[in-house]
Amino acid sequence: MSRARCHALFLAAVSPRGATTRVAVRRGLSAWPVLQEPDMEYQDAVRTLNTLQTNANYLEMVKRKRGDPQTQLEAMKLYLARSGLQVEDLDQLNIIHITGTKGKGSTCAFTERILRSYGLKTGFFSSPHLVQVRERIRINGQPISSELFTKHFWRLYHRLEETKDDSSCVSMPGYFRFLTLMAFHVFLQEKVDLAVLEVGIGGAYDCTNIIRKPVVCGITSLGIDHTGLLGDTMEKIAWQKGGIFKSGVPAFTVLQPDEPLAVLRDRAQQISCPLYLCPPLQALEEGGPPLTLGLEGEHQRSNAALALQVARCWLQQKGYQDAGELKASRPSLPGQLPLAPVFQPTPRMQQGLRHTEWPGRTQLLRRGPLTWYLDGAHTTSSMQACVRWFRQALHRCERPDSGSEVRVLLFNSTGDRDSAALLKLLQPCQFDYAIFCPNLAEMASTDNADQQNFTVTLDQVLLRCLAHQQHWSRLHEEQVSPDPWSTPGQEQDGPASLLLAPHPPHTHSASSLVFSCISHALQWITQGRDPLFQPPSPPRGLLAHPVADSGATVLQEAADIHVLVTGSLHLVGGVLKLLEPSLSQ
């Protein structure tokens, strides 16, 4: 049987029953076919979307034989044309394009919320999703409904199916490309006033970078991540991120190390892009009240400063008068980037910052004796910020009058990230237990397609969890360095201190466990003290460890249990799905 025939049979197996009328590709929004669709449920749509994920073995082959990245952008333009749009159609979306290594999602969230406070209808495309894939496409801050997602998914899927060439090596776009295309169509159909577009990976060759004329661009803090795709130095990564610059389109960035900042400056000059350096948020607060941010953590101030500049620039470009009164200008130093304006944030800007929500980033949930600290940090720099936030939050907590306090780490890391370096940063938090599990909500779960991931095998992720456990054990065996978070001469009980309150180690200190899925890990951590989770029945889901029983007793008797979930946004999403079942409705 031919490869094309096999592929056709496979698509028939996963596609919904029923047929659609074939139509020729026509440009513009009017090109949608009139579909006679059967009752296609949301989960069916997501399962079909998941067939566009690259299987693990094929993904490895692609990495070894990666072609010209510029060709990938040309392919994306072809997909766009097959979907019924041309690149120039995207100009009307008034796009804000944001990239960076850390904080780009939070910066997008701040920016979107600020502009929504002006009464504008906003679109927001982000990745990854935490619980449901429809979170990636938002209108006015809310994920599109299951019904709207399903409708747009099948329209786009059938359009691409009808226009594919079976002789082509790539007949359908991959998962992320498909969702990017879908976001463009949703935003145009919903007639948003603007679209905030978060880059997937990198910038220069990311599929979001097919846009021609964004209104403004932003680059958040840079760091080392996705080295297999972007390069293994800050300079190489900065070059990739600067690829979103467009001639004549204003761009803003935050303070970066000298070398990558120089790369961004040179890249902007080559492209004739006016690039500005954002003053710190403190400069915008001078002479006015301190700004309250809806997202916790000191590192969010940098993201908020960038969001304010980007939002103000967008408002000015679109002729809005109420965009913040300028303060005294600060001259730029010779050879450095020009500084962005220092202005007084308007009441609507302040409101937007205050009401920003972005789940899974410095998020805190209290449920009885358990407090969950959720942050998807996955680079060394973002993990430093996560640890600082976690320790400051613990410092503010009231200590129990009686009973013990237990600290638990729930961790996973994926891809080519250096998990040993991340775990070393977490060690000074004095965890009693370190729990490792894959980003799999439940074992053998087929009822929720949103959480399915075909790009890795179960064997691979479990072996990686065991490697995390070994790294953690070695760190404690080596009795690593004094606390890197303390400052010489700093008073341990001072208000600015990051040192934790005294936390006498238990006899099981630094113990670690590996579970086969998130659900089993949460059952063990909660020990029946959360009505959502039944007490575990050892050794269900547990790769055997001698301290499981003794640890269960400690958790059952503890007055307070503090759980930090970090290392992967997908892990955080799986935990949120189980802690907040309403998010899956």
From Swiss-Prot:
Monomer. Belongs to the folylpolyglutamate synthase family. Its main location: mitochondrion. It comes from Bos taurus (Bovine). It catalyses: (6S)-5,6,7,8-tetrahydrofolyl-(gamma-L-Glu)(n) + L-glutamate + ATP = (6S)-5,6,7,8-tetrahydrofolyl-(gamma-L-Glu)(n+1) + ADP + phosphate + H(+). The modification Phosphoserine is found at S537. This is Folylpolyglutamate synthase, mitochondrial. Coiled coil: none annotated. ATP binds at G103, K104, G105, S106, R361, D375. Pathway: Cofactor biosynthesis; tetrahydrofolylpolyglutamate biosynthesis. The gene is FPGS.
